[in-house]
């Protein structure tokens, strides 16, 4: 588990140094898993390191400085730390379900945003930074000296975030899209050979630098026009009045602007639907169910309702329900969730609710979730939510069907 996660403040190098010094052991455990996963996919470590160094230009100097800080703090070589950051999404892609009720479709007239974070497990996840063959999820608070404050969820020891909220009232999430191209033999190999971008790192950049959803999307778009995402997938940004969804594959990009309407994404493209796999039943079921739930209470969507939707077991409980369950650690199942309620008048008072563990368990126990606004400080966060213990207690594949 992670012992000192994770409030980071100051310069990017200092933020990285803090992470490296606090999580050196955990980062090493994740690196072991990272290289083992890539090995099983047929990658050669030296070739990947070489490509990682060549891809350094994908990151701005602030990000490079943060990675250097992590490397120094954890006493890990910079090339390996850089490569881990660049290609993390290739080894451990985000699955996930995202829903948003934008503007007037929210009960307060402002946006409500939800993401369930789903991931596969691996028999390489066996260190203290893991539990039941899954990465431990923790709450992170980032306060860079020249950017917005961000609260979100991350895997222990990983700098990129799964989903988060900024003090400008911008919410964000990501998910992979299962495409015909991705299923073809050798496509994953291409993700290393080309300069490719990590969605989770991109949304963090958008949250730190963007003052609204469109601006956050504009911040990440120049890079996407030059280089594809590491795997096909979506990025979702939302503020009080507007949502922006970016779909990207290796050669295609599409964007949807959402105003006073509902939207959702599972692991299937909507705009680039000709690329989607027809046999991905889970993504189809979850996407349809998200729209059913949102349409039924359009204009009355609240944080409490989104939390309820996060626990939804229709089409399951199992891999086809929004709260996803499995019978083997290798299946894609829900590990954490976040619901964000934007305050358009006072963005710093926007609220985020985070559940660590299986949503149907964690949302029902105060020990496993937190609801706060953007003024949260280190003393406001329960130790179990910072060190991963709450996640370990409330991660299970057994469905919780009690009221």
Q: Where would I find each of the regions flagged by the language model?
A:
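C-terminus-biased signal that marks the final domain/tail of proteins
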Residues: 1-95, 104-106, 209-246, 259-403
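Amphipathic, alpha-helical segments enriched in basic
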Residues: 42-46, 147, 191, 195
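Generic secondary-structure boundary/loop-capping signal
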Residues: 162, 204, 371-373
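Amphipathic repeat-derived elements
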Residues: 133-141, 250-252, 256, 266
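Structured soluble/peripheral alpha/beta segments that form catalytic or ligand/cofactor-binding pockets
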Residues: 154-163, 167-172, 177, 218-254
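Helix-start/capping segments and mature chain N-termini
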Residues: 158, 165-223, 279-289, 293
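Internal mixed beta-strand/loop scaffold within catalytic domains of large alpha/beta enzymes
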Residues: 87-192, 335-340, 347, 351-354, ...
């Amino acid at each position: 588990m992670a012992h000192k996660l994770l409030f980071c403040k100051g310069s990017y190098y200092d933020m990285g140094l803090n992470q490296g010094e606090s999580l050196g052991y955990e980062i090493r455990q994740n690196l072991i898993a990272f290289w083992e996963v890539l090995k099983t996919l047929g990658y050669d470590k030296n070739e990947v390191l070489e490509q990682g160094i060549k891809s350094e230009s994908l990151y701005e100097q602030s990000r490079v400085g943060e990675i250097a800080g992590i490397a120094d703090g954890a006493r890990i070589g910079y090339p390996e730390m850089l490569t881990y950051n660049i290609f993390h999404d290739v080894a451990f892609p985000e699955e996930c379900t995202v829903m948003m009720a934008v503007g007037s479709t929210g009960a307060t007239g402002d946006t409500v945003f939800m993401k369930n974070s789903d991931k596969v497990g691996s028999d390489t996840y066996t260190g203290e930074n893991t539990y039941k063959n899954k990465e431990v999820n923790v709450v992170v608070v980032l306060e860079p000296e020249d950017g917005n404050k961000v609260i979100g969820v991350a895997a222990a020891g990983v700098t990129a975030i799964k989903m988060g909220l900024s003090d400008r009232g911008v919410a964000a999430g990501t998910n992979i899209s299962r495409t015909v191209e991705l299923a073809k033999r050798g496509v994953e190999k291409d993700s290393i050979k080309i300069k490719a971008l990590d969605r989770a790192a991109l949304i963090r950049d958008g949250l730190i630098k963007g003052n609204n959803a469109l601006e956050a999307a504009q911040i990440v778009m120049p890079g996407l026009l030059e280089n594809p995402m590491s795997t096909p997938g979506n990025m979702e940004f939302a503020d009080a009045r507007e949502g922006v969804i970016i779909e990207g594959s290796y050669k295609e990009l599409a964007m949807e602007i959402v105003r006073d309407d509902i939207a959702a994404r599972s692991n299937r493209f909507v705009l680039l639907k000709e690329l989607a796999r027809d046999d991905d039943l889970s993504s189809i079921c979850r996407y349809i169910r998200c729209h059913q739930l949102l349409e039924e209470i359009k204009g009355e969507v609240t944080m409490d309702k989104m939390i309820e939707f996060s626990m939804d077991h229709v089409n399951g409980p199992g891999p086809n329900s929004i709260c996803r369950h499995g019978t083997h650690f290798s299946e894609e199942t829900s590990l954490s969730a976040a619901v964000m309620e934007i305050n358009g008048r006072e963005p710093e008072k926007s609220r985020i609710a985070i559940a660590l563990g299986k949503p149907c368990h964690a949302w029902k126990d105060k020990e496993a979730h937190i609801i706060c606004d953007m003024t949260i400080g280190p003393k406001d966060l329960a130790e179990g939510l910072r060190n991963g213990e709450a996640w370990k207690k409330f991660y299970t594949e057994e469905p919780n069907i009690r009221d």
